[in-house]
Amino acid sequence: MDGGGVDTATTAAWMEKHRHMYERATRHPFTVSIRDGTVDMSAFKRWLSQDYLFVREFVAFIASVLLKCCKQEDSSDMEIILGGVASISDEISWFKNEATVWGVDLASVSPLKANLEYHRFLRSFTEPEISYAVAVTTFWTIETVYQDSFGFCIQDGNKTPPELLGTCQRWGSAGFRQYCQSLQSIVDRCLANAPADAVQSAEEAFVRVLELEIGFWDMSSSRS
């Protein structure tokens, strides 16, 4: 242990400590219904359109993480984070193509309440006083929730509708899981050298992302 008294298993410890909330975020009834083959397709279309808006906002967030990374003495994380930036253009194109397939008019979509709340949270990371450790923790948590959620939809025994397998494989793939693990390693390393107040702020960000993800899934299932 060093820095804020944190060892290299900090993220794993958080996932255990906040297990109930983590499972609510990654085994939400919405994504479980995809795996079970019982998903309401109108809910899926709502998720598709709202997540498209989220991803557009996510671009600025990743840029803020990258900027904080560049200011670190050791900027070796940059290549991994740049991988996230590079994938965004493809992701936006994917959403547009899927919207066409599903007959969703993205131009007419407005962000719902839970989405706007998430947007406000992401925008707060442009503030210079928010540390790189907190920012990269947030980035890792967002990506990991999606990987775990959609990865579950393609595990053995799934009844995921064939037309949704591409969506689930996009975030549930082994390649994306490896990317999330790379981010997790960065987070653990940063936290091992961070002061106690930064570690606490990072844990609070971890929990906040879980809350926002649950709200986003809830929004997809309803119209709130």
Swiss-Prot record:
Q: In which pathway does it act?
A: Cofactor biosynthesis; thiamine diphosphate biosynthesis
| GO cellular component: a single term | cytosol
Q: Check the record and name the SUPFAM superfamilies matching this protein.
A: Heme oxygenase-like
Top-level taxon of the source organism: Eukaryota
Binding site residues for substrate: 51, 91, 143
Tissue-wise expression: Expressed in roots and shoots.
Q: What class of enzyme is it?
A: hydrolase
Give EC number(s), comma-separated: 3.5.1.-, 3.5.99.2
Q: Name one GO molecular function term.
A: thiaminase activity
The record's disulfide annotation reads: 153-168
Under which name does UniProt file this protein? Bifunctional TENA2 protein
Q: What is the lineage of its organism?
A: Eukaryota, Viridiplantae, Streptophyta, Embryophyta, Tracheophyta
